[in-house]
Amino acid sequence: MNHSTGNSSNNKEFPGSNLEFQVGHVDRVIDTIPSRRGHFKRSGGGGPCCNKASVPGMVTQRSCVYGGARVVLMPITDAAHIVHGPVGCAACTWDIRGSRSSKSDLYKTGFSTNLEEKDVVFGGEDRLLKCILEVDEIYSPSAIFVYSTCVSGVIGDDITAVCRNAEYKTGKWVIPVQSEGFRSFNKSLGHQLACDVLLDHVIGRGDAEVGERSVNLVGEFNVAGDLWEIKRLLEKMGVKVVASITGDSTVAEISAAHKAQLNLVQCSKSSGYIAEEMEKRHGTPHINVNFFGMRETMDSLISISEFFGLELAEKWVLGMVEETKRKVARYRNTLEGKKVAIYVGGNKAWSLIRAFEDLGMEVIMSGTQNGLPNDYLRIMEKSGRELILFDDANPVELSRLLNKYRPDLFVSGAKEKYLSYKLGIPFCEFNHDRIKPFSCFRGFLNFAEEVDKAVNSRVWKLAAPRTFLNCGVEYGYE
């Protein structure tokens, strides 16, 4: 995985928008402090400054390396996940990433060694070993993942040695995850560390037999049940899913993932690296897929059917597309021409663009918290027109963007929801806190319905237009 630091650039001139939408000077998309101006660009002037440490003193919504590792590994349903650090690091485990399970619920239970001051002085290795043995005795998990945090990393606890000792005592797989938060400013390193853990300690250790036309879904985390709709369509095509890495998965399924005939790469940051490594180590080919949006789903299913030579499946897929178009038409009639702002993960940012085109809507702004240069290049390629790109926006900067350009819809996560509402801008949850699946054709209908409800709710006609504290003037930005 590429963790290089630098700006993305693309000097290609994009055709103008079909809406009356003008963007100011490239360095004055919004008013902010000089060191942040490069993070807000017009796509015609290249991508924004990205993949850099946040400016000291600025509020950021980014997560840490440990946060990146845990969202990849914790959806493994029958494993125990022990956080070796202060109890605060183990927060929000019950509904981690919104991942649903049709199997065990053990992954939702949070375990922490709850390091305190005396452990910083005397070390926490004994406490960690005791915790591992206790969890194994009470819950008997298929495997135990142990996550290092900033505190345990600073005091020098050797979690690898403790895990080796615990593995000998329990007979279970006890797997260290060296995910100290201070290792990088970008949680993407945590994604890669988690992938390395799976490659080195899990994948390849299983011996289950798999049949013909078998695949792994790599980078699918079953948010709100997305995985189940993908599996339903693949099974109708005669394709079997060996393992989902990692949503609604088990340790045994992932351990046999190397036997699948094809890897389907769903989320670029979490899965591109692991798919490339599996091809090197096990010879498993991979193709990129995207099951969000009507056309993206169609293209993905056709690519899979071509790989396995399933000619009849292609006709069935095209029939599903026509049926979905008919059902989406009533939403498109009320959404045509509306403007959209996006602030999500890098992979989601570009995949949303075509989906909104299917609804007749136009993306005028797109940003990410941890985007890499390639993410912004893909956003520009998918858009084909000029738009505003921004990186790691803090709440004041975000409020300024929304106030200045007033999109008809803002798509982001729970942390940005109430900012949007306070500004009188309709909002759609797309990250981990949504409750409806958005994958494939049925999921796209759910998405269209949610967007229509948000944009065309009568409440916005009753609410007076609002600004947010003079857009941050009181913070000394002017």
Swiss-Prot record:
What Pfam families is this protein classified in? Oxidored_nitro
Q: Which family does it belong to?
A: Belongs to the NifD/NifK/NifE/NifN family.
- Any coiled-coil regions, as ranges: none
Q: Which UniProt keywords apply?
A: Nitrogen fixation
The protein's matches in PROSITE patterns, at most eight in alphabetical order, are given as: NITROGENASE_1_1, NITROGENASE_1_2
Q: What is this protein called?
A: Nitrogenase iron-molybdenum cofactor biosynthesis protein NifE
Record's InterPro entries? Answer: Nase/OxRdtase_comp1, Nase_comp1_CS, NifE, NifE-like
Record CDD domains: Nitrogenase_NifE_I
Q: Which GO terms describe its molecular function?
A: nitrogenase activity
Q: Which domain of life is it from?
A: Archaea
Q: What does this protein do?
A: This protein may play a role in the biosynthesis of the prosthetic group of nitrogenase (FeMo cofactor).
Q: Which GO terms describe its biological process?
A: nitrogen fixation; protein-containing complex assembly
Q: What is the lineage of its organism?
A: Archaea, Methanobacteriati, Methanobacteriota, Methanomada group, Methanobacteria
Metabolic or biological pathway, per its Swiss-Prot or TrEMBL entry = Cofactor biosynthesis; Fe-Mo cofactor biosynthesis
